[in-house]
Amino acid sequence: NEWKNKQWSFLLGGRLDKHNLVNHIIFSPRANLRFNPTENVNLRITYAGGFRAPQAFDEDLHVGVVGGERLVTVLADNLKEERSNSFSVSADLYHKFGNVQTNLLIEGFYTDLDHVFALRQLDKPDAQGNTVQERYNAYGAKVLGLNIEGKAMFTRWFTLQAGLTLQQSHYDEAIAWNDEVPEQKYKKMMRTPNTYGYFTASFTPVKRFTASVTGNYTGSMLVGHSAGSGVEDPVAVHTPKFMEVNMKLAYDFPIYKYLTLQVNGGIQNLTNSYQKDFDKGWNRDSNYIYGPSLPRSY
């Protein structure tokens, strides 16, 4: 249900889900309060509950290779659904500086997680002799941070958009990421950078021609590196920062009425910001991959 007038709106709702791996019905509530003190200022407070079912994920369907042995993922017995309670406060601001239209969004967020999914390697292999890692319910976790996004339309042919997120992601209790090194325990969540952002610049000097420059920034993060060809013993690595810049040119050729042919070309990852320390050989860690998916490509 939603109640609103010109300045205020209040939305209250919920969702019921039934999953075949969960014995009970899951209720996820949500609430939203909006206040517009002026036409160009939008203030909002939001709460949302959510869940993630104890199921196999896409990455579980791919068999990894660690130290020359296959690694498969299984679900622990009595694995519970992961639950979340998320809160956010945001200010959405609009202003015009002469002919330049701008928009600034500032948002703070906090998420409390229960029955968080985590992975641990089991001592015994499966019937086929594969090394097995088990998805189980670890302790709770918290994610909080600040998101800032800005947009500006300088002219009809030039627009700029950029965003930056600062966040912290921690388990309530330290977790050993690899059973071979139980002393290496971390509260920090693996593969979650504290800083990441993006930008997009679009140029349309003539009607059918568009040039765009985009970028993605990924800050340093913690990634597990299992023993193999790269390292003798398992170690958690702090990755380097990455700044990926892409360029694209596009031109539209009208063919007939509503039919248009677009020809485009460009460079992906112009800065060649790419992982430098891949494992090699039969005993590599195939899961030790991070950062942009491609090197400089044309």
Map each language-model feature to its residues.
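Signature of Gram-negative outer-membrane beta-barrel scaffolds
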Residues: N1-T38, N42, A53, G64-V65, ...
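Residues that define the transmembrane beta-barrel architecture of outer-membrane proteins
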Residues: K4, I25-F27, R83-F87, G140-L144, ...
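Gram-negative outer-membrane beta-barrel transporters
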Residues: K4-S9, F109-D112, N130, E134-A227
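Repeated loop/turn-to-beta-strand initiation elements of outer-membrane beta-barrel proteins
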Residues: Q7-F10, N40-L43, F97-T102, W157-L160, ...
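Transmembrane beta-barrel strands of outer-membrane/channel proteins
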Residues: L12-L16, A31, I45-G49, D58, ...
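Outer-membrane beta-barrel "beta-signal"
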Residues: N32-R34, S88-A91, G291-Y298
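Membrane-embedded beta-barrel scaffold of Gram-negative outer-membrane proteins
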Residues: N36, R44, N78-Y136, K142
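C-terminal beta-signal and adjacent terminal beta-strands/loops
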Residues: D114, Y217-S226, Y251-Y298
